[in-house]
Amino acid sequence: IKDFPGQENDYIDFIRIACHPDKIKETLSIAENLYDKGYEIFVQLMDISNIDNFGYKILEKWTCKNILKSLYCADSYGIITPLDLEKTFIKLKTADYQNISFHGHNNSNLALKNSLTAIKLGAYSVDITLNGIGRGGGNLNAAELLNILNNFSAKHYNQLSEEYAEIFKE
């Protein structure tokens, strides 16, 4: 943390901190310290299918939830089912997390289905990658999600296509 000079003296605006289920408490402490230095903070809970009740209790009791721009749920091994993802979102919403996001891997070909589930549940954001490039089974292919969203009036999709229209043309 000491290597981060503070947002006013840095070119970095935000920091996304990833943590394994056994490091939640330490990660939340780091998040608080970096927030105090002026950074926007995102925390990514990796391997969400293996967060136990103790991990959820730590998340529930944390008193600084409001400092997070978003709390990411990462399906690190691409094995979570849409039903289990829904249960995870409900636990986090019940614990008063406002902006919950999703980062899916496609090992079981569920990245698209899980991302659509997260969107239905009110996800703040879902991660996509070009051609689904990513570790292991890859991540959600941007074209797959954008093709589906193109058929619906997704409120943020138009903003995305307007801002990146030239890139999409290429």
Where are these regions (language model features)?
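Catalytic cores and adjacent flexible loops of soluble metabolic enzymes
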Residues: 1-170
